[in-house]
Amino acid sequence: MAPIVPVASVAPVHLSGPKRSSRSVYILLIPGLAWLAVFFLIPLFTLFMTSLQKESASKPGTYVFGIQLSNYANALAEYWPQFLRSFVYAGLATILALAIAYPLAYFIAFKAGSWRSLMLVLVVAPAFASFLLRTYAWKTILADDGVVTSTLNSLHLLPDGRILNTGIAVVAGLTYNFLPFMILPLFASLDRIDYRLIEAGSDLYASPAKVFWRVTWPLSMPGIVAGTLLTFIPAAGDFINAELLGSAKDRMIGNVIQTNFIEFRDYPTASALSFALMAAILILVFGYIRRSGTEDLV
């Protein structure tokens, strides 16, 4: 009978390296999560609780905690025209921004050559000026005695004889102020397209229009979706353009929220309008992303 040879015991392997590494990742997340909680989640929760408050019976003008869901119904019933106007203006500004930005982004990506860097700097340059200052500049440009209005009046293109204090001025201001947010995502998306694919379409005797709609446009869809979202979302909640470039009948929901917060101090109504606007935008955004077939963006 052969002798039994004892098998040497194998020391257990400790995977301290990967565990320690994953633990370090979670530790690094703490500052970001703390910042998100303090400056986003807690204020958001506070705003939501404020939207449910009711007016104190003993002290008119002050509000106490309560579950007052009628705040939402009353706010929407009173201010639905401003809601609708905000989405219409934001939608028009987004469409105009896309129509202006796409050819420019295409030119920078494929045709600019050595001028590419300079053109990108010029696209970003307006952002170095204050948003408020840029809007005031448009107020001067579109003034009744300005060159733009005088020229259009001489051509009989303005039925009201003016641009300032109209919805046209508000949409123009929104388009201009948020145009860089449309150009940059489009450029990034177009710049990733292999130009040989476009050349291949031409080699297969496809017309330029067919190459664009079958090749370039689908491949640039992530940039289109990102650009339209980055333009539409802030435009829908904007109040500066309507305040400076529009009239009382051109007020957007952002103006109503500002007025209720600062002037009327009707905090429940203002908070309810803010949450309703947020919910409406989220519904539109998710529907738009699903319809465009770019669910991977979320």
Label each region the model flagged.
Residues K59-T62, F239-R265:
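Glycine-rich helix-loop "coupling/hinge" segments at transmembrane-helix boundaries
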Residues V25-L29, P103-I141, I198-E199, F212-W213, ...:
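Cytoplasmic-entry segments and transmembrane alpha-helices of multi-pass inner-membrane transporters
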Residues T62, T135-T175, A209, L245-K249:
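Membrane-interfacial helix termini and adjacent extracytoplasmic/periplasmic loops
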Residues A2-A11, S16, I27, F187-I198, ...:
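C-terminal transmembrane helix and the adjacent membrane-cytosol boundary/short C-terminal tail
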Residues A2-T46, F107, S117:
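N-terminal signal-anchor/first transmembrane alpha helix
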Residues F40-Y79, I141, D145-G146, G246-A248, ...:
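Short membrane-interfacial helix/loop motifs at transmembrane-helix boundaries
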Residues A77-F110:
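Transmembrane alpha-helix signature in integral membrane proteins
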Residues P31-A34, F39-F40, V121, A125, ...:
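Transmembrane alpha-helices
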